[in-house]
UniProtKB/Swiss-Prot annotation:
A Gene Ontology biological process term: L-histidine biosynthetic process
Reaction equations catalysed: 1-(5-phospho-beta-D-ribosyl)-5-[(5-phospho-beta-D-ribosylamino)methylideneamino]imidazole-4-carboxamide = 5-[(5-phospho-1-deoxy-D-ribulos-1-ylimino)methylamino]-1-(5-phospho-beta-D-ribosyl)imidazole-4-carboxamide
Species the sequence originates in: Jannaschia sp. (strain CCS1)
GO molecular function: 1-(5-phosphoribosyl)-5-[(5-phosphoribosylamino)methylideneamino]imidazole-4-carboxamide isomerase activity
Catalytic residue list: 8, 129
Main location class: cytoplasm
GO cellular component: cytoplasm
Classification lineage: Bacteria, Pseudomonadati, Pseudomonadota, Alphaproteobacteria, Rhodobacterales
Pathway: Amino-acid biosynthesis; L-histidine biosynthesis; L-histidine from 5-phospho-alpha-D-ribose 1-diphosphate: step 4/9
UniProt KW Isomerase keyword: yes
UniProt superkingdom: Bacteria
Protein's name according to its UniProt entry: 1-(5-phosphoribosyl)-5-[(5-phosphoribosylamino)methylideneamino] imidazole-4-carboxamide isomerase
Keyword presence, Isomerase: yes
Length: 238
């Protein structure tokens, strides 16, 4: 199981939100590239980036910070937030992003996801963010009637590289991930599922890993707060 350290970008800073509320952001580092380098130096195999402003704006906003991170690191990086057309997808992949994460557009324009996955094999993931089993979009600001498993199954044969499943109510709350819901989703689809939201301890990582069906986990606040030591966590998962 791969551990993805998270860098959420807001106004050029590395921040964490509490339960997806932009008004409840804690700035952890004003130099995201330095933060990314620190994660790389600790031994991570991947980085997970989110352009929070971009998720709300519907287009990239923190591009300069993302490019600084790419210049400062060599590990593969996945990026989500405000990526809603082929030009943006191609632009980021050309600039060195290893995998783009499509969230809102997966609900609103699923054909674009299929088109992108065909054009860029292995480089397109779907981000499914949910409250109580229903998908939320536009930076979690809008809730839909779409069920998580239905959305995942819609891309079963599309060539999507991964599904990043975030339980919004767990995100940034340090209360542990929704292991059962994440495992249920992983069992419902053949697409690799990455857990996000609430991953805050070695016990959480162990619980996710022992399901045997979850391919990765994303952690942010716990790494910044020191509740989870990245080197120790990577060693535990090795």
């Amino acid at each position: 199981m791969i551990l993805y350290p998270a860098i959420d970008l807001k106004d050029g800073n590395a921040v964490r939100l509490l339960r997806g509320e932009m008004s409840d952001a804690t700035v952890f580092n004003t130099d995201p590239a330095a933060q990314a380098r620190a994660f790389q130096d600790a031994g991570c195999d991947w980085l997970h980036l989110v352009d929070l402003n971009g998720a709300f704006a519907g287009e990239p906003v923190n591009g300069a910070a993302v490019e600084a991170i790419l210049a400062a690191t060599s590990v593969p990086t996945q990026l989500g937030g405000g990526i809603r057309d082929m030009a943006t997808i191609e632009g980021w992949l050309t600039r060195g992003i290893a995998r783009v994460i499509l969230g809102t557009v997966a609900v609103e324009d699923p054909d674009l996801v299929r088109q992108a996955a065909r054009a860029f094999p292995g480089q397109v993931a779907v981000g499914i963010d949910a409250r109580k089993g229903r998908v939320a979009t536009k930076g979690w600001a809008e809730e839909t009637d779409v069920m998580v498993t239905d959305l995942a199954r819609a891309f079963e044969d599309a060539g999507v590289a991964a599904i990043i499943y975030t339980d919004i109510d767990r995100d940034g709350a340090m209360g542990g991930p929704n292991v059962s819901a994440t495992a249920d989703l992983a069992r419902a689809t053949s697409i690799p599922v990455i857990a996000s939201g609430g991953v805050s301890s070695l016990d959480d990582l162990h619980a996710l890993k022992t399901t045997g069906v979850i391919s990765g986990a994303i952690s942010g606040r716990a790494l910044y707060d020191g509740a989870l030591d990245l080197s120790e966590a990577l060693h535990a998962l090795a």
